[in-house]
């Protein structure tokens, strides 16, 4: 015997409301009692099922009830239905006690079915069909009944779930409420009956879901880790952290500056410096200069890094923030020049230095000129650290790879990484294709590399500003307005 469960789970933080709808063989009642009877437990089932056929309203069974009055109809009663596969089920509802019972005992249902056919044939001009499966009146009426009652039940259950969700939450804020409804069948012979939808229906539903997703994608940000949706309006205030799993998603350079630097203290440097096409890089898809212009319009930036001076908890700092949204944060001649000028300014003014790394490496469109930036920046850092004895902190975010990792990304006095950051010199795909070896999953994640001693701290975004402030004060950099 099959057993069907309908689980409706509503979560709101620590609150859990579960409506378990299970099967019982003792709660069968006649369908005519859907209007008259209050007692769902009636023993003389055969007799009562036959009396159903005696009602004149059977011919209008498709108008028996609608979605509006289904609550009264199914409040505490049982009725017989037949699905499109020919399986007979007795269904029992008790909304007040959250009970939804389905029974498909084959021996019992066969007896009910034969009784049903006999009485339906009697109604059809008083004749009895020898083969009820070919009774056109019976098939048409039962098909209409099945479709109508299934749609009414579905509509009612969905409306009840929505109403319960609203009452429990006290608001329509869906960010704290998650409704999960599932129907599963515990049966050894459910593979054929599990999905009766046609391929055309599935394609239409998938197309509809895709259209809805595309229509509202500007309202949500999907997590790369758990694939949960985060409301974009509050995403920035939560520091681009996933509400479901806490995963650190990518941040723009402007958002990072706003997060780290005190309001009203940011002074950008070299904003008018833009890339040209020094080696006249040829591309069949799009010229390099046009691609630069496209990213400038898309991001509102002139290059893949923002540099400037600001205050962090009242402490003057020089900071460079790379932006992965601009050509993958790749390091070209302008990126290298802006960072070098910032380091030279910090050396001259004796300022602590922060560089937030988010890059795919050197920019191939500029050839060897982009590789030269590694040596140029490293040389400026040597003077800053070794000769002037100043304090430099790189912050490695996801991803930090290639020439950035091989140069200033790993030259800090104290190296900080974000949780779950992807940090590598060569990417996983490049290593596997070059060496023909499999790179283990997680071997280039911040947590694994931290255990190998590659950097000093893993700091989440929430306490990052206070951690930097303490490090600067430990190295004798104090706020200007300290009382």
Swiss-Prot record:
Q: Give the CoA carboxyltransferase N-terminal domain ranges.
A: 219-483
Q: Name one GO cellular component term.
A: chloroplast stroma
Q: What is its EC number?
A: 2.1.3.15
Residue ranges that the Swiss-Prot or TrEMBL entry lists as coiled coil: none
The entry's keywords = ATP-binding, Chloroplast, Fatty acid biosynthesis, Fatty acid metabolism, Lipid biosynthesis, Lipid metabolism, Metal-binding, Nucleotide-binding, Plastid, Transferase, Zinc, Zinc-finger
The cofactor note from the UniProt entry for this protein is: Binds 1 zinc ion per subunit.
Q: Which domain of life is it from?
A: Eukaryota
A GO BP entry: fatty acid biosynthetic process
Q: Which InterPro entries match?
A: AcCoA_carboxyl_beta (IPR034733), Acetyl_CoA_COase_Trfase_b_su (IPR000438), ClpP/crotonase-like_dom_sf (IPR029045), COA_CT_N (IPR011762)
Which pathway is recorded for this entry?
Answer: Lipid metabolism; malonyl-CoA biosynthesis; malonyl-CoA from acetyl-CoA: step 1/1
Start-end of C4-type zinc fingers: 223-245
Q: What is its main location?
A: plastid
> Where can this protein be found?
Plastid, Chloroplast stroma
Task: Please name the GO terms that the record assigns under molecular function.
Answer: acetyl-CoA carboxylase activity; ATP binding; carboxyl- or carbamoyltransferase activity; zinc ion binding
Q: Which cofactor does it need?
A: Zn(2+)
Its catalytic activity? N(6)-carboxybiotinyl-L-lysyl-[protein] + acetyl-CoA = N(6)-biotinyl-L-lysyl-[protein] + malonyl-CoA
- Is ATP-binding among this UniProt entry's keywords? yes
Which HAMAP family does UniProt cross-reference here? AcetylCoA_CT_beta
Check the record and name the PANTHER family matching this protein: ACETYL-COENZYME A CARBOXYLASE CARBOXYL TRANSFERASE SUBUNIT BETA, CHLOROPLASTIC
Q: How does it assemble?
A: Acetyl-CoA carboxylase is a heterohexamer composed of biotin carboxyl carrier protein, biotin carboxylase and 2 subunits each of ACCase subunit alpha and ACCase plastid-coded subunit beta (accD).
Q: What does this protein do?
A: Component of the acetyl coenzyme A carboxylase (ACC) complex. Biotin carboxylase (BC) catalyzes the carboxylation of biotin on its carrier protein (BCCP) and then the CO(2) group is transferred by the transcarboxylase to acetyl-CoA to form malonyl-CoA.
Q: Indicate the family of this protein.
A: Belongs to the AccD/PCCB family.
Name it: Acetyl-coenzyme A carboxylase carboxyl transferase subunit beta, chloroplastic
Q: What is the gene called?
A: accD
């Amino acid at each position: 015997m099959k057993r069907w469960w309908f689980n409706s789970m509503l979560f709101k933080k620590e609150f859990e409301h579960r409506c378990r709808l299970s099967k019982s063989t003792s709660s069968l009642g006649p369908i005519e009692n859907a209007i008259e009877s209050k007692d769902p437990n009636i023993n003389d089932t055969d007799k009562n099922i036959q009396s159903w056929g005696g009602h004149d309203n059977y011919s209008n069974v498709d108008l028996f009830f609608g979605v509006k009055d289904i609550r009264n109809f199914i409040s505490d009663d049982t009725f017989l239905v037949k699905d499109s596969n020919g399986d007979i089920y007795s269904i029992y509802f008790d909304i007040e006690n959250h009970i939804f019972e389905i029974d498909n005992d084959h021996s019992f249902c066969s007896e009910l079915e034969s009784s049903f056919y006999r009485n339906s044939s009697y109604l059809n001009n008083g004749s009895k069909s020898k083969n009820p499966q070919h009774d056109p009146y019976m098939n048409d009426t039962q098909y209409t009944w099945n479709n109508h009652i299934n749609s009414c039940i579905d509509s009612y259950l969905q409306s009840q779930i929505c109403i319960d969700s609203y009452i429990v939450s006290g608001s329509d804020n869906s960010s704290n409420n998650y409704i999960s409804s599932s129907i599963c069948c515990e049966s050894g012979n459910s593979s054929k009956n599990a999905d009766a939808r046609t391929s055309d229906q599935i394609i239409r539903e998938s197309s509809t879901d895709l259209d809805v997703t595309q229509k509202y994608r500007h309202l949500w940000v999907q997590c790369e880790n758990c694939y949960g949706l985060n409301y974009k309006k509050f995403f920035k205030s939560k520091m681009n952290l996933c509400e479901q799993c806490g995963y650190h998603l990518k941040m723009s350079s402007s958002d990072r500056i706003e997060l780290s630097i005190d309001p009203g203290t940011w002074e950008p440097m070299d904003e008018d410096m833009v890339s040209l096409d020094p080696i006249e890089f040829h591309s069949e898809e799009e010229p390099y200069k046009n691609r630069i212009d496209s990213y400038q319009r898309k991001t509102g930036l002139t290059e893949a890094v923002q540099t400037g001076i600001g205050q962090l908890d009242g402490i003057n700092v020089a900071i460079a923030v790379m932006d992965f949204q601009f050509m993958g944060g790749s390091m070209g001649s302008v990126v290298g020049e802006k960072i070098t000028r910032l380091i030279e300014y910090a050396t001259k003014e004796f300022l602590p230095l922060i560089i937030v790394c988010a890059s795919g490496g050197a920019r191939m469109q500029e050839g060897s000129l982009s590789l030269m930036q590694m040596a140029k920046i490293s040389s400026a850092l040597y003077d800053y650290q070794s000769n002037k004895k100043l304090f430099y902190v790189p912050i490695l975010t996801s991803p930090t790879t290639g020439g950035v990792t091989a140069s200033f990304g790993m030259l800090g006095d104290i190296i900080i990484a974000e949780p779950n950051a992807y940090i590598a010199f060569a990417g996983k795909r490049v290593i596997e294709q070059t060496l023909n070896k499999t790179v283990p999953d997680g071997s280039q994640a911040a947590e694994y590399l931290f255990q190998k001693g590659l950097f000093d701290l893993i700091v989440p975004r929430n306490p990052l500003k206070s951690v930097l402030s303490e490090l600067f004060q430990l190295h004798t950099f104090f706020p200007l307005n300290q009382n």
